[in-house]
Amino acid sequence: MRYTTSFIVFCFYIFLFTNLVQGGLVRICNHRIEGYGTCGPNGRKICLDAFWKNQPSPGLSKNLEGCQCEDRRKRPQFKGLSHSCSCCWSYQGNSDE
């Protein structure tokens, strides 16, 4: 029984050390995209399309966790109504970035 417990603890330490060295999962929620027009009923789809067209780091294997669309009213740089998308995404921390 003593050796079994020691073996389990040893495996746990290997697992923990491997994740610390590789960096684990990195989660980022500050990717903002702005665009023309309002969000409307399919605002989430607009944000998802914009995210995949304008990825934060094209070389990474990313997992999109979700996007939220917000109307931004009239803004001078868009010459009319605009929207803003806020997206959360994650990637494995052992990339070369």
UniProtKB/Swiss-Prot annotation:
One of its GO terms (cellular component) is extracellular region. Keywords: Antimicrobial, Disulfide bond, Fungicide, Plant defense, Secreted, Signal. GO terms for biological process: defense response to fungus; killing of cells of another organism; signal transduction. It is found in: Secreted. It comes from the Eukaryota. Residues 1-23 form the signal peptide. Its main location: secreted. Disulfide bonds join 29-88, 39-69, 47-85, 67-87. InterPro entries: SCRL (IPR010682). Belongs to the DEFL family. PANTHER family: DEFENSIN-LIKE PROTEIN 241-RELATED, DEFENSIN-LIKE PROTEIN 245-RELATED. This is Putative defensin-like protein 240. The lineage of its organism: Eukaryota, Viridiplantae, Streptophyta, Embryophyta, Tracheophyta.
